[in-house]
């Protein structure tokens, strides 16, 4: 253990005492969860605390021991009782008849009821300091502690090593194995952030164009503030003095802001001077560069866009730019310090990429709602497939989805207003004047809108994000015409113009020229109106991160009009949509979709084509309720009453089907079991069963916590069965899913058995036991099944017995006879370290094998020591194989190693080559999808089984 001077220990004691004295009275109701000393001898792992991006990256080896991690955050979780009390408070704060209506909390008041105790906070701070870390900040809301330290200190305290990794040409720092914490902290720590420097990407699309921004000759139009005022009916508010005066909008950033560009934008737009305030937390992120974790040019454009347009829609509002090395660090501090009543964050990612930190951030967003803060976020720019998009390793736009339907967080949080995107669609009507007027506007009136969808092979996936959350249940206020009966949080809530092509937003932003070795500032923009100083081009942006700060500006006008904080805006938005004012407040978008082209056989895309959601009457999963009329929104905001259900304790639901594979028309029985998430008790209420999102039968009352339903009306195909528990006066809602296969009663078909199961590897480097899969032909189906394997695990080596591997396609072939069965046993090998003598660092060896695109595969089950220069070169040869190389049989690798003397201790270590370490397979639980496809005449038949790989 590191020794400390008496001065250090004295300072620590004073810090702990200060925290205690400051909060003693208000924290009296919070119990201690840490009993006794925090010992490192007994530890528990924190699952889902490895970045999926790190798992896809090339490992360059351990980072230097003194590598500094400037902002690590240990997040705490509430007890079930605290969560129930907070849920109740949030409901009461939105009910006009409640004594808690709009009684917003301070951070200290939040901590007093929902944070950890001062004793526990001080104990954790003390333990961190003993490990050598420096405390950055202790959450005012009792939700987290931030600290800084080195890679060596992280390894000592959390049992995980920080590595240097490379992804898409960028170098990053990341942990590649799950961190662990002392058992004494297990009940209160939910996640650790800051062990990697993968930064969230902005949701903007930038194009620089040279035509005039309004041209009767070219027909090109771009949005200036004056156009926005006309299209979304902001002008009547501004003319009556509702312009944002007295309201602060906090904009989240992760790059230095150029204040001169903000000033020139306001001049070009005819807006009064209004200099933003900058608040920095932690290390200054600086300007764009190619250094690890540094800002990008996209961050610059995002910062300028958000500040300029939030301040354009609410021209007299105070704009606070909250800056740090990561936008979610900025968000954390904006909430914990209660910096502003309205928060705009234009950064996000698909839900599954957050791992366990999604729960920590959602709890933080609950704190924001309790404090009366309104948070708005983009719904994403990859259509209904948010886990796809961006660019591939070659820098080309990704235009085909492979990861299935997904939504963006934080927009998917029930405590955030998610903003989608539309395209202005004039048709044959002339909605534009030939010359610009006030605030550079030329739009004549509201312009009809369709779903934003610019997806193409050139643009890549480029459409309004939206869909169904896999992380959050449907909040009680999310109801109304068009809202799906999916029992999940649906996204988005509203939408505004977002297409950069028709018609994009004008901004002023530094024009950066990028090259292979450097990024050079080519000069400021907007030197001649909105034109850049160099080529005279216009900087035009789009994406849902353009609609987001604009909607934040509208909400600032609403807040000034109502004279009160809004808190979570969604309950009122949905109340307005369900009242008599829908057509006054919203512009319903009924044309278009956010569907994404998808690869046949990939997740959620068994037959190819596209997946996504279309627009419709009322609410839809592409644009929410549509765009808004700002004037009517502000004037009618207080005209509705929000009614909510009471808060309950968390519940858990499980569902099973019997049989899991049957013939169409046969009876299948669904059984749901509901229990408290913790403690004892017997939930009452009902369970609604659904098949592929459609209700089957009426809700079934629980009997001793169990509901049973039988049906013979399930259609043929792979189906998802959902059981949704309604909740009761004590327990909240919950849901669960199960997979079944129903084969045709008359047409050629086949089934897979089992449809679920678990493969377990005792440790990284071990193989799973063979898991037999049986394929059964019906109605004369015969031919060859094509098998594929997909998983999110970073290093794995699947193989099938009785099936022939096709190296060119990364698939397996399995013959099946008419009305017969075929069996193939799946084995998954995992990767562990192979030590190379002659190197000062233990190294890990991974050989690309049966690689699916973008996934590294390891040579599982190898053990031993490679010694001598020749053996090291052989290992280097294997590591150098391209990651996307077709399959190399493991026998070739074994043969080469044997020829060079693969054994423990053979050869000598003189001149041994150092290998780039490889992380091997991460521990944890990972989904594995096995898909089987066969053609029957002109029909392609596909079935899948959903398995789980557990690496212990």
Language-model-detected regions and their locations in the chain:
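Bacterial N-terminal signal peptides
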Residues: 10-19, 893-901
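Substrate-binding/charge-relay-adjacent region of secreted/lumenal peptidase catalytic domains
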Residues: 29-140, 146-147, 151-421, 456-543, ...
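Polar, glycine-rich mid-to-C-terminal structural blocks
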Residues: 414, 418-462
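An often Trp-containing, charged/polar helix-loop segment at the C-terminal end
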Residues: 427, 481, 559-621
């Amino acid at each position: 253990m590191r020794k400390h001077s008496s001065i250090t220990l004295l300072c620590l004691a004073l810090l702990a005492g200060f925290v205690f004295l400051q909060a003693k009275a208000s924290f009296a109701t919070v119990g201690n969860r840490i009993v006794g000393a925090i010992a490192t001898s007994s530890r528990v792992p924190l699952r889902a605390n490895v970045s999926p991006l790190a798992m896809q990256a090339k490992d360059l080896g351990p980072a230097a021991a003194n590598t500094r991690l400037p902002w690590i955050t240990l997040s705490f979780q509430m007890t079930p009782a605290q969560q129930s009390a907070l849920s109740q408070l949030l409901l009461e704060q939105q009910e006009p008849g409640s004594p808690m209506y709009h009684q917003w909390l301070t951070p200290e008041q939040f901590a007093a009821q929902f944070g950890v105790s001062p004793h526990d906070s001080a104990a954790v701070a003390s333990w961190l300091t003993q490990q050598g870390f420096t405390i950055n900040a202790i959450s005012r809301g009792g939700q987290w502690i931030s600290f800084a330290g080195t890679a060596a200190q992280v390894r000592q305290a959390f049992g995980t090593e920080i590595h240097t990794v490379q992804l898409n040409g960028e170098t990053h720092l990341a942990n590649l194995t799950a961190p662990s914490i002392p058992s004494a902290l297990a009940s209160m720590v939910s996640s650790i952030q800051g062990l990697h420097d993968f930064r969230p990407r902005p949701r903007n699309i930038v194009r620089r164009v040279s035509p005039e921004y309004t041209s009767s000759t070219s027909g090109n139009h771009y949005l200036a503030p004056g156009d926005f005022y006309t299209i979304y009916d902001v002008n009547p508010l501004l003319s009556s003095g509702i312009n944002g005066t007295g309201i602060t909008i906090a904009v989240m950033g992760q790059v230095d802001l150029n204040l001169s560009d903000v000033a020139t934008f306001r001049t070009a737009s005819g807006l009064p001077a209004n200099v933003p305030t900058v608040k920095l937390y932690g290390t200054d992120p600086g300007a764009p560069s190619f250094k690890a974790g540094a800002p990008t040019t996209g961050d610059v454009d995002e910062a300028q866009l958000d500040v300029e347009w939030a301040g354009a829609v609410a021209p007299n509002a105070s704009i606070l730019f909250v800056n740090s090395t990561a936008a979610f660090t900025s968000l954390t501090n904006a909430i914990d310090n209660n910096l502003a009543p309205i928060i705009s964050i234009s950064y996000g990612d698909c839900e599954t990429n957050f791992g366990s930190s999604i729960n920590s951030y959602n709890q933080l967003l609950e704190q924001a709602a309790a404090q009366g803060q309104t948070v708005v976020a983009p719904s994403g720019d990859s259509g209904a497939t948010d886990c796809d998009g961006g660019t591939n390793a070659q820098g080309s736009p990704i235009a085909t989805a492979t990861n299935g339907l997904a939504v963006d967080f934080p927009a998917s949080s029930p405590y955030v207003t998610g903003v989608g995107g539309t395209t202005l669609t004039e048709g044959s009507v002339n909605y534009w004047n030939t010359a610009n007027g006030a605030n550079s506007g030329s739009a004549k009136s509201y312009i009809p809108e369709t779903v934003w969808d610019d997806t193409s092979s050139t643009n890549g996936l480029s459409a309004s994000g939206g869909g169904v959350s896999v992380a959050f249940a449907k909040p009680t206020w999310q109801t109304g015409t068009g809202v799906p009966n999916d029992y999940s949080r649906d996204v988005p809530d509203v939408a505004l113009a977002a297409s950069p092509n028709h018609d994009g937003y004008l901004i002023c932003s530094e024009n950066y020229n990028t090259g292979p070795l450097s990024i050079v500032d080519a000069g400021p923009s907007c030197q001649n109106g909105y034109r850049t100083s160099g080529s005279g081009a216009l900087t035009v942006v789009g994406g849902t991160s353009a609609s987001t700060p604009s909607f934040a500006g509208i909400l600032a006008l609403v807040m000034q009009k109502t004279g009160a904080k809004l808190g979570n805006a969604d309950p009122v938005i949905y109340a307005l949509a369900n009242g008599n004012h829908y057509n006054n407040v919203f512009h319903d978008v009924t044309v278009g979709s956010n569907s994404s082209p998808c690869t046949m056989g990939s997740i959620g895309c068994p037959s190819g084509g596209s997946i996504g959601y279309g627009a419709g009457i009322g609410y839809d999963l592409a644009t929410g309720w549509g765009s808004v009329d700002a004037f009517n929104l502000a004037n009618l905001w207080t005209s509705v009453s929000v009614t909510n259900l009471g808060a309950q304790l968390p519940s858990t639901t499980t569902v099973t089907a019997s049989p899991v594979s049957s013939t169409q028309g046969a009876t299948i029985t669904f059984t749901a079991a509901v229990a408290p998430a913790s403690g004892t008790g017997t939930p009452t209420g009902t369970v609604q069963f659904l098949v592929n999102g459609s209700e089957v039968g009426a809700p079934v009352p629980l009997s001793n916590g169990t509901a049973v339903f039988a049906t013979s009306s399930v259609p043929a195909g792979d189906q998802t069965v959902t059981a949704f528990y309604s909740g009761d006066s004590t327990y909240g809602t919950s849901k669960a899913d199960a997979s079944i296969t129903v084969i045709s009663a008359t047409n050629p078909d086949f089934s897979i058995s089992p449809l679920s199961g678990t493969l377990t590897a005792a440790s990284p480097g071990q193989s799973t036991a063979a898991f037999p899969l049986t394929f059964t032909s019906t109605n004369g189906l015969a031919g060859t099944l094509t098998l594929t394997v997909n998983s999110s695990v970073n290093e794995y080596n699947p193989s099938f017995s009785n099936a022939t591997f096709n190296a060119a396609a990364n698939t397996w072939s399995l013959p099946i006879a008419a009305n017969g069965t075929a069996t193939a046993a799946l084995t998954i090998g995992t990767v562990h370290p192979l030590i190379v003598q002659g190197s000062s660092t233990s190294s890990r060896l991974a050989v690309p094998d049966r690689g699916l695109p973008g996934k590294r595969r390891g040579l599982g089950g190898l053990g031993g020591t490679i010694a001598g220069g020749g053996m090291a070169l052989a290992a280097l040869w294997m590591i150098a194989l391209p990651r996307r190389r077709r399959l190399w049989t493991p026998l070739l690798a074994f043969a080469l190693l044997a020829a060079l003397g693969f054994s423990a201790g053979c050869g000598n270590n003189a001149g041994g080559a150092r290998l780039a370490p490889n992380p091997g397979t991460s521990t944890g639980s990972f989904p594995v999808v096995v898909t089987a496809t066969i053609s029957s005449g002109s029909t392609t038949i596909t079935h899948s089984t959903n398995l789980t790989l557990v690496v212990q």
